[in-house]
Amino acid sequence: MHRNLGDKDLNLPQYYNNRELSWLDFNYRVLQEAQDKNNPLLEQLNFISIFSSNLDEFFMVRVAGLQDQVKMGYDKPENKAQLTPKQQLVQIKLKNKEIVDLQYKRYNELIDDLKQYQVEIIKPEQLPDDLLPQLESEFKYGILPTLTPLGIDAYHPFPKLNNKSLNIFVDIDTEDDINSAIVQIPSLISRFYSFNKGDKQYIILIEDIITYFINDLFSGYTVLNTFTFRITRNADLTIHEDGAEDLLIEIERFLKERKRGTAVRLEVDGRQATHEDIVWIINQLDVHDNDVYFVDGPLDLTMLTDLVDHLSNKLKYLKYNKYVPQIPQSLGNHNIFDLSLKRDIFFHHPYESFEPIVDFIREAAEDPNTIAIKQTLYRVSKDSPIINSLKNAAENGKQVTVLVELKARFDEENNVHWARMLEEAGCHVIYGMTHLKTHSKIALVVKRMNNKLTSFIHLGTGNYNDKTANIYTDMGLITTNAEIAEDAINFFNYLSGYSVKPEYNKLIVAPFDIRDVFLARIDNEIKSHRENGNGKIIMKMNSLTDKDIILKLFEASCAGVKVQLIIRGICCLKPGVPGISENIEVVSIVGRFLEHSRIYHFHNNGDDIIYLSSADAMTRNMIKRVEILFPVEDKNIAKRLLDYMNLQLSDNQKGRYQDELGQYHYIENNLSPLNSQAFLMKEAMDYGQQLKEDNTRPQVMSVNERKGWFTKIRKQFRK
């Protein structure tokens, strides 16, 4: 793909950010939240945990994929920053090491800060003497029975260690020679143990407890040295869809295989490890020096989520103030089905409650007038009320069709479980589509009303997950629009059968049309700007990687169209480059909630065109996923969306802008402090409070209403 605009070559690598390095920049912005002292202390620790969890997935998928390319001898540069796989791996190591060093520096600072609240993370030898019997009892009865030391010699080869498992390497003097052993720490027991003395709480990590009592595992030998290490394995494996007679069985095979993928990262607690032992482990695991990370602290800081939960009761004032999602402004106290017959209903989670969406499916399942329910599910919670409602609907005799996407990465096992359960309840379950992931969020309820069928459609930007709906920002719409209803019916028929691509009235569906519509809308904005001088595009998404769309945005910028991009994560476009992207602005917001909604706005000379979507402007969303882009035609809802995006562009507390070199900086100006997420929480709470007051205020009846009331009373007495 080569694109010139006049004498400008738009393909030059200096105009682009590499996808993987841009993702690392995003994860650093997550780490910045752990460095932000305006966040409560326990929340700062939580952000360190999120940073680690993100990084695990990055290595299991993205780094693993690059390593596979290098092993196969593939050295073609990617199509934007034009880095080969090997060059990307080198730069990932350099950037990630720098960021991880900052992570551990901040971790150690925060652990030190906990001391002022009478909480200390210590080694066993630092525990007060009178608590040592309790420690010994915990080890003897709660830990030791779960451990299996694995000696390594000619008769005992190096064990196949599980992905993300925590292990202790042990050097043992056996008189004749020095041998090695591995102690794998079971994942199903607690990572830390708490000991109390007065107001003081001592926390000891399980690896430190095992190390303290290590001689009990190797009785009769001398332990010379120990250190902890952790392996991350390749989870970017191929699901063989073509030859699979039953995709459920194939997914289960794939899940077993993924646990034992090749090692892609070795993390070592560098405080005790020796060079000789590290070289030995590297050879056993067949990893390269570039894959080894030494850290100054405990491994796997995802455990901080559990630690924060453990400390939350005692130190709840060191967490965010609890926020309860409010009744949606667009819904108020109305019944969702009654109101949607009159107008579209808009939802903005988590500021507004996800409960009405749960109720939407539950009420449909219970209503005897409901004929059919159809829904796509990508990620749902472990105890999903929506799943329960779909089961109930099928058991109540309604026709229920559910597409459960079995290939939703790291949710495959959960989704296999739900697929089986739904089938047992009598639902017609679709496992997805060959070589595509169904990422769209749509639910269709068909009811018999007044002797005719009426369709109610929910379309959203986020998953039908009642848990993540409290921490992800997402949007949704419920409508009874006849054209969208027809589209929804055709869409589900496409998913459930062998029908070719349907024709749609209003919905725009990938992998067929979303990219083409984006390109056409941008072209139209360029044309409009040349004619009217007011071209403007605002896009909000998680990530931007698709080169066709980036090139078209460059064209728009060169034509003078103002382009504002609100992109939380990966952004392969560099804004502000003179003559190329000088009219493009990129802002990223990382805060309390994960920004997840996708909004696409085209000014269209004042006749605004606004879409919501399940899709980011990423190549995978354009060609490898089934996605839905849907129009927002209600003027009041459209205004809310525009106001929302302008609010986010004004965020000078959690907003960062990207400069022409691809670097991100906090937005600093002389305006009043504005945290867009905090603003929206307050706005929702104010509405909720006003609604509550309106409901409790005595209602004053009109004269006619009073007459009607007295008439009813007289009739009662006549009876």
UniProtKB/Swiss-Prot annotation:
A Pfam family reported for this protein in Swiss-Prot or TrEMBL: PP_kinase_C_1
GO BP: polyphosphate biosynthetic process
Gene3D superfamilies: Endonuclease Chain A (3.30.870.10), Polyphosphate kinase middle domain (3.30.1840.10), Polyphosphate kinase N-terminal domain (1.20.58.310)
PTM per Swiss-Prot/TrEMBL: An intermediate of this reaction is the autophosphorylated ppk in which a phosphate is covalently linked to a histidine residue through a N-P bond.
Positions with a binding annotation for ATP: 54, 472, 568, 596
Necessary cofactors: Mg(2+)
UniProt keyword DNA-binding, yes or no: no
Catalysed transformations (reactions): [phosphate](n) + ATP = [phosphate](n+1) + ADP
The enzyme's E.C. designation: 2.7.4.1
PLD phosphodiesterase domain boundaries: 434-468
Leading EC class: transferase
Entries under InterPro entries matching the protein: PP_kinase, PP_kinase_C_1, PP_kinase_middle, PP_kinase_middle_dom_sf, PPK_C_dom2, PPK_N_dom, PPK_N_dom_sf
Role, per record: Catalyzes the reversible transfer of the terminal phosphate of ATP to form a long-chain polyphosphate (polyP).
Protein name: Polyphosphate kinase
Organism listed in the record: Staphylococcus saprophyticus subsp. saprophyticus (strain ATCC 15305 / DSM 20229 / NCIMB 8711 / NCTC 7292 / S-41)
Gene transcribed to yield this protein: ppk
